[in-house]
Design a protein with these regions (language model features):
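Boundary/linker segments flanking structured domains
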Residues: 1-37, 42-120
Length: 120
C-alpha cells in the first residue's frame, strides 16, 4: 500500500482531510520506523468528521487515508484493506468484518469471491 502517513491529531486531520468526502483509512503506530496497522475503517460521507470523532484519536499516532467517490467505494476499499491486513497476519483492533453501508445490501467482493468458489 502506497500512502502517506500523517500524525493523528485534530489539527493535521483538519488540514489534510477534506470535508464531505467518503473514503477509507487505517490507524496505526510507529515501531522501528515502520507503520504498524491497528484499525481499518471508513466513512460513507465525511472522512474528516469520522477521524476527528474516532475513539482511537488519541490512542493511535498515525493515519493513512484514501478518498472514494461513493459509499460503495469506501466499503470496498475498507474491505480490501481489512482483508489484506488479516491475510498478512496483522493484529487489528477491529476483528469484525466491515459492515456494508446503511440501507444497502452490498456484499464484500473479497468474501463473495471466496464463497463462490466450488469445493470438490
Amino acid at each position: 500500500m502506497n500512502a502517506t502517513p500523517y500524525r493523528m491529531t485534530p489539527d493535521v486531520i483538519r488540514s489534510v482531510v477534506q470535508k464531505y468526502r467518503p473514503g477509507a483509512y487505517i490507524l496505526g503506530d510507529e515501531n522501528n520506523g515502520q507503520l504498524i496497522f491497528r484499525y481499518v475503517g471508513r466513512s460513507d460521507c465525511c472522512l474528516q468528521t469520522r477521524l476527528l470523532t474516532h475513539g482511537l484519536l488519541y490512542h493511535c499516532s498515525y493515519f493513512i487515508f484514501s478518498y472514494t467517490n461513493t459509499a460503495k467505494g469506501a466499503f470496498e476499499l475498507e474491505s480490501k484493506w481489512w482483508h489484506d491486513c488479516k491475510n498478512s497476519g496483522m493484529n487489528l483492533l477491529n476483528i469484525i468484518h466491515p459492515d456494508s453501508p446503511t440501507g444497502s445490501s452490498l456484499l464484500c467482493p473479497y468474501c463473495h469471491f471466496q464463497n463462490g468458489i466450488k469445493k470438490y
